[in-house]
Swiss-Prot record:
This is Glucan endo-1,3-beta-glucosidase 10. Its EC number is 3.2.1.39. The active site is at residues 119, 266. Residues 350-366 have a biased composition (Low complexity). Glycans are attached at residues 124, 362. One of its GO terms (cellular component) is plasma membrane. The keyword Metal-binding does not apply. It is an enzyme of class 3 (hydrolase). PROSITE patterns: GLYCOSYL_HYDROL_F17 (PS00587). Induction: By infection with the cucumber mosaic virus (CMV). It holds the Pfam family Glyco_hydro_17. It comes from Arabidopsis thaliana. Residues 367-384 have a biased composition (Gly residues). Plasmodesmal-associated membrane beta-1,3-glucanase involved in plasmodesmal callose degradation and functions in the gating of plasmodesmata.
């Protein structure tokens, strides 16, 4: 009898083990609409699947987009623009917004997050800064009233300009002049379990100091990297160093913030720019985004400071947006042209393992149609990094490639736990 029970348990163990993918893509894409030539949102899903995306971040709560993603399997993040913060401080208006723009589309459209404001604390607008935290509280309160606070989190996005310095990561802290506004937000993250969102662009760091910043280091290409003298952690790419700079800043504020997760809400590289925008080329954009997406597909998204945490990243952006103000680069961050053709080849292949409901393999980038969105930006500044030197650390390389092994160990432990319980019964 005991032998039969153990055989049944072993069968369940095998089923659980092989039904859990050891490598699971968690690729996010920013989907903006600051353009007058984009196709309708219903045509966007094939493009997102072609790059292996499973998460999509909007810059508004566009009804057409929310309807288009119904039943698609994609996890959606919606947003409240800075222009709405003052009125969303009113709990009644916040509740109306949540009911109309979030609850009305559930459960068919899988909305998982609301981003309240973008780079507000570094906007140098005191009225906007004052309205941010009350708006976050009101939106969260509205989710609580609707019984949605367990499935949808509330957060806001920051630029790296919230840091006083960003090199080396172990020396970073948050700007003192922002702590009064930032600390209540960090307490909110601790209380609600929501992540802090960071817009991180290694492109800006390279553009500002190309003589002293290694291009290979910022493009995820093979390089010597550098070892942080304060932590002895080795970094072979700038994005991870920027993320760990924020983790160091969180640790410096207080022990209660050590468990606040980070999401990279924007990162990308422009394929074109003005003459003075050093590094804004199609080849560099192809390398940055292609290498980044390949890393996400292979589950190597764990930084030295938080090797136990998988880092969620949203690439900016899905389309080139022809109506964005600013330098030429601002209109050239897209993976795709408005007609759905790829701006450049990412050199990746996707299958049903890496796409949201896609049943066939695709070679990117992209063959079908395009999409829409509203506002979005790549205005965040990257930290200035010094010349990178040093040798790659074998220990760090083993940390960052430790992707799916944890699931296997968990399954084994779970199986033996079941055996012990069964034998005792």
């Amino acid at each position: 009898m005991a032998s039969s029970s153990l055989q049944s348990l072993f069968s369940l163990f095998c089923l659980a083990l092989f039904s859990l993918p050891l490598i699971v893509s968690s690729i996010g894409i920013n989907y903006g609409q600051v353009a007058n030539n984009l196709p309708p949102p219903k045509n966007v899903i094939p493009l997102l699947k072609s790059v292996g995306a499973t998460k999509v971040k909007l810059y508004d709560a566009d009804p057409q987009a929310l309807r288009a993603f119904a039943g698609s399997g994609f996890e959606l993040t919606v947003a409240l623009g800075n222009e709405y913060l003052a009125q969303m401080s009113d709990p009644i208006k916040a509740q109306g917004w949540v009911k109309e723009n979030v609850q009305a589309y559930l459960p068919n459209t899988k909305i998982v997050a609301i981003v309240v404001g973008n780079e507000v604390l570094t906007s140098n607008q005191s009225a906007l800064t004052a309205a941010l935290f009350p708006a976050m509280q009101s939106i969260h309160g509205a989710l609580v009233d609707c019984g949605l606070n367990k499935q949808i989190f509330v957060t806001t996005a920051h630029s790296l300009a919230i840091l006083d310095v960003s090199y080396p990561p172990s020396a970073t802290s948050f700007r003192r002049d922002l702590l009064g506004s930032l600390t209540p937000i960090l307490d909110f993250h601790v209380k609600t379990g929501s992540p802090i969102l960071i817009n991180a662009y290694p492109f800006f760091a390279y553009e500002e100091n190309p003589k002293h910043v290694s291009l290979d280091f910022v493009l995820f290409q093979p390089n010597q990297g550098f070892t942080d003298p304060g932590s002895n952690f080795h970094y072979d790419n700038m994005l991870f160093a920027q993320v760990d700079a924020v983790y160091h800043a969180l640790d410096a504020v207080g022990i209660s913030y050590k468990k606040v997760p980070i999401v990279v809400s924007e990162t990308g590289w422009p394929s074109n720019g003005d003459p003075q925008e050093v590094g804004a080329t199609c080849d560099n954009a192809r390398k940055y985004n292609g290498n980044l997406i390949k890393m996400m597909m292979s589950k190597k998204m764990r930084t030295p400071i938080r090797p136990e945490c998988d880092l969620t990243i949203f690439v900016f952006a899905l389309f080139n947006e022809n109506m964005k103000p600013g330098p030429t680069s601002e209109r050239n961050y897209g993976l795709f042209n408005p007609d759905g053709t790829p701006v450049y080849s990412l050199g990746i292949k996707t299958s049903s393992t890496h796409s949201s409901g896609s049943g066939s393999s695709n070679s990117t980038g992209g063959s079908s149609s395009g999409g829409g969105g509203n506002t979005g930006g790549s205005s965040s500044g990257g930290g200035i990094y010094q010349p990178v030197t040093g040798n790659p650390s074998p220990d760090y390389m083993s940390i960052s490639s430790a992707g799916g092994k944890g699931r296997f160990v968990e399954c084994v432990l779970f199986f033996f736990l079941l055996c012990i319980i069964k034998l005792r019964l």
